[in-house]
Amino acid sequence: MITAKSIEADNTSWAAALNEYETNRAGPLTAPLISTIAFPAMRHFADDWVELIDAADQRDIDQALAPGTPATVRAGYLAQRRYQIPLLRNPTEGAVEVLADSVGTLSVAMQRPLSRGSVRPSSRDIFDLPPLVDPRYCSEPFDCLVLARALLFNCALVRTRAMAELQPVAQEPYFCPDDLSDQRHVTDSRMLELARQYLATEFHPSGSTAMLPLDLGGVVDTELRVYGTQGLRVVDAGVMPMVLGAHLQAAVYAIAERAADIISDR
């Protein structure tokens, strides 16, 4: 990505780049963090997408949940899956995000994960110690299988005529196999291993204080009030019960505007 350090590495002074931006609103400082995104549906990048979704739909849901998950949260997760599985089958709903950063590096991000982690207090005083966060990535195997196929999709993208002219190469330890026709063989071996090993957060947390009925593990009601409290609302991405097939920012703005309307009407 383009940063002060990378600009200096290219023998362009930071002061000159800053002056170019302040004077003309041009130059390397106009480069965004992410320059290009796409949200392909399952059928657009996974040849065996029907088989993958069917297998996930039939799998024991407790595998995807943290040990000791309360019965209400389990019930809420089951309700989410009844909604989420059809979304994965929908040809107009993004299952992953393909994103290119400011220097053209392609990566992928899961948009419809079936795995569930946990966020628990580590102290009676919330300001004393940070919470215990366990994302439990790919506790539902479906997620990493999808990511592995999405990585192969990136390989196909860089072999298109338009991209090939730029002579892109895979960054180690990732690779692009010579033959992309047998997705299952490749993704169930080395590519799947890489997806599991290097999986990391995209720093877009959501869902920790879900808007759901209390008996489905919800934390806030439809007016964003925390159950069992007075005068306490949550107004952020935490109220989203499921990850969106999109970036969160616009949705958070909408939640905030709705919260303002609710509060001003009181």
Residue ranges: model-predicted function:
Residues 1, 105-163, 190-266:
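C-terminal structured subdomain/cap of oxidoreductase catalytic cores
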Residues 1-100, 163, 167-169, 175-189, ...:
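Mid-to-C-terminal "cap/lid" subdomains and adjacent gly/pro-rich loops that border
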